[in-house]
Amino acid sequence: FFGGGNIAQALISGLLLNGMSNKNIFFVDRNPLNQKKLNNLRVKSLKKSNSDIDIVILSVKPKDAIQAYKEILNNYKNPKIVSLVAGIKSSTYIKLDNKSEFMRAMPNTASKYGQGITALYNSSFKKSNFKKVSSIFSKLGTVIEVDNDSKIDTFTGVIGSGPAYFFQTLKSFEKKLMRLCNQDEKIVREIIANLMKGVGSSIEKDGDLDNLIKACLLYTSPSPRDKRL
């Protein structure tokens, strides 16, 4: 991992949780706080270039991406690079170097728990190497291959920010539940977690959102008899 911020930490945690050895994961990051968090996961910092590194995952902020990409090119011979950086198209990187294998990936932070969603776009990876990367991300949840570079940017909003939309909605539930449950945070957290688990299970078993909405409304709406009572 070239960059050890939040998304890198989430992916590394998920990989370790799902059986990958920490001996197979390395990181490069100058931030002392990130170094400390990753060291706590028993992942080693790579102090210098290593020809044994199979895949380099570019996981820095967009403003640092091109400089970091150049550093990778200078330190690794014909590297296989997977970019997690939002908003920078494959062509921008390939113009700098067209010999290295390159692809983009857009995971979300739920990868930390093995419940993530990752979109992949293959720019120039060999088929066998692309399968290897897809296999790695499949340890973290669902993998979707897209056929267009621009779709990765769309997935940034849908997948990357998707959990935030739900969390924002849940904040209003939390506020009401706190009043109903006499400010008991533990109970409220349990209710919200079970609510989301139930929603997930319902979608897995049925899948038709209209039917699920109707079922909920039928269950919660009073019948004519109830109204008379």
Locations of regions flagged by a protein language model:
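Rossmann-like NAD(P)(H) cofactor-binding subdomain of soluble oxidoreductases
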Residues: 11, 26, 33, 50-120
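Small-residue helix-packing motif on alpha-helices
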Residues: 25, 35, 65, 184-191, ...
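Internal alpha-helical scaffold of NAD(P)-dependent oxidoreductase catalytic cores
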Residues: 92-101, 117-154, 165-205
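Single conserved hydrophobic/aromatic residue that forms the stacking wall/gate
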Residues: 219-229
